């Protein structure tokens, strides 16, 4: 017999969502990983871009929602939700649904005689009938080739920093036009750094949150899903992953891009006053220069700075997960680094599932956000528990999550 029916690799929002739904269905589960580890490394002072409802883990209603956290703890959470509060909330969820989480990292995942074998730090071996990979995006920072030759003291990714105040008094060139780059520039300015933003596009996209939804009043739910991904109308479409995965790529790819194109929350605008933003420029080279860095743009213009901060996002490539054994990786059908997934988010290796951003190619852009865990947890549980697949269902419709020890 295996040691467990399901081993979940990762204890962030997706791993916790999977555990909540699986345990609610009576499935034997072991959760492996440091709870909310990636979120704990994000920049101090960061605010979440997602709205209140879409920030809930596992479900936007029920015993582990953000509303339930506030009611149970008496904690008042500001809007936008501060990173520190979200980590506190995620830890509360973990304590309720996975108090037995095993914090040792998984060093190797391979096929085993009873399904899969996981080697944990310290040498322990764990056999599982099924494995759910919910390991997040920490392994996938997108670092442009022009920065390859620069030392870490000259060029880093936004994901490398927990506290941007280390750049106080420095000149920092921030690359990118999305939330990560723009919020980093705001935090740098507020920390006493001299920041400039360089954007390849000729304009910035801004997300106005609930502004348009409030104007629509009762019509809002018809055009905006609680998942909070995508613009008006399209939000409802991408909130149905079972529908999205049936689209031909010629339709799916443009829909996905339109839903998650680089954009910043509108509330960042006032915080960027005084920060130069250079539009329609692409960096073609970056070289070390006298303790700093010099970048050259496509039109020949140049900038010098003390540091180059890459707000260039993440590019999924599951081959970069350090724990995946090459023999297992070779059996996985992949497209551009993404695993090709079927019903229940199952990969081409039976019994191996991928949740979160790696599922975005097959199930759409909401898999890149916390709210995607609502669908992922339910779909995974239906597959694992052997329940019949229901008809297409809105990803925002809640499922009942029964937690045995909710005290």
Segments the model singles out, each with a brief description of its role:
Residues 1-36, 79-179, 183-407:
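Flavin (primarily FAD) cofactor-binding/catalytic cores of flavoenzymes
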Residues 40-73, 225-245:
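Flavin (FAD/FMN) cofactor-binding and adjacent substrate-gating region
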């Amino acid at each position: 017999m295996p040691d467990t029916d399901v081993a979940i690799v990762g204890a962030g929002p997706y791993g916790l969502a999977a555990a909540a739904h699986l345990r609610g269905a009576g499935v034997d589960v072991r959760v492996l990983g440091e709870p909310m580890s990636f979120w704990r490394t994000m920049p101090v002072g960061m605010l979440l871009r997602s709205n209140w409802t879409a920030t809930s883990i596992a479900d936007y209603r029920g015993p582990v929602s953000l509303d339930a956290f506030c009611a149970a703890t008496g904690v008042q959470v500001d809007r936008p939700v501060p990173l520190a509060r979200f980590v506190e909330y995620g830890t509360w969820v973990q304590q309720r649904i996975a108090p037995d989480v095993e914090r040792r990292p998984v060093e190797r995942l391979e096929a085993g005689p009873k399904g899969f074998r996981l080697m944990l730090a310290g040498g322990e071996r764990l056999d599982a009938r099924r494995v759910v990979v919910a390991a997040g995006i920490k392994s996938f920072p997108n670092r442009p080739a022009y920065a390859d030759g620069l030392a870490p003291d000259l060029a880093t990714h936004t994901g490398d920093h927990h506290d941007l105040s280390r750049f106080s008094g420095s000149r920092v060139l921030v690359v990118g036009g999305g939330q990560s780059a723009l919020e980093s520039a705001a935090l740098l300015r507020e920390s006493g750094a001299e920041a400039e933003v360089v954007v390849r596009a000729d304009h910035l996209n801004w997300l106005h949150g609930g502004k348009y939804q409030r104007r629509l009043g009762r019509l809002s739910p018809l055009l905006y899903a609680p998942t909070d991904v995508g613009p008006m109308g399209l939000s409802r479409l991408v909130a149905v992953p079972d529908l999205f995965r049936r689209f031909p790529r010629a339709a799916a790819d443009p829909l996905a891009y339109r839903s998650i194109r680089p954009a910043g929350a509108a509330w960042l605008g006032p915080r960027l006053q005084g920060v130069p933003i250079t539009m329609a420029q692409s960096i073609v080279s970056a070289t070390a220069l006298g303790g700093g860095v010099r970048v050259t743009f496509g039109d020949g213009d140049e900038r010098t700075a003390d540091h180059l901060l890459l707000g260039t996002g993440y590019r999924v490539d599951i081959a970069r997960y350090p724990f995946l054994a090459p023999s297992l990786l070779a059996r996985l059908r992949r497209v551009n680094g993404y695993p090709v997934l079927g019903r229940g988010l199952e990969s081409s290796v039976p019994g191996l599932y991928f949740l979160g951003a790696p599922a975005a190619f097959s199930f759409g852009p909401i898999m890149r956000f916390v709210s995607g865990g609502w669908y992922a947890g339910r779909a995974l549980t239906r597959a694992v528990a052997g329940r019949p697949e229901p008809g297409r269902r809105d990803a925002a419709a809640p499922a009942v999550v029964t937690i045995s020890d909710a005290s």
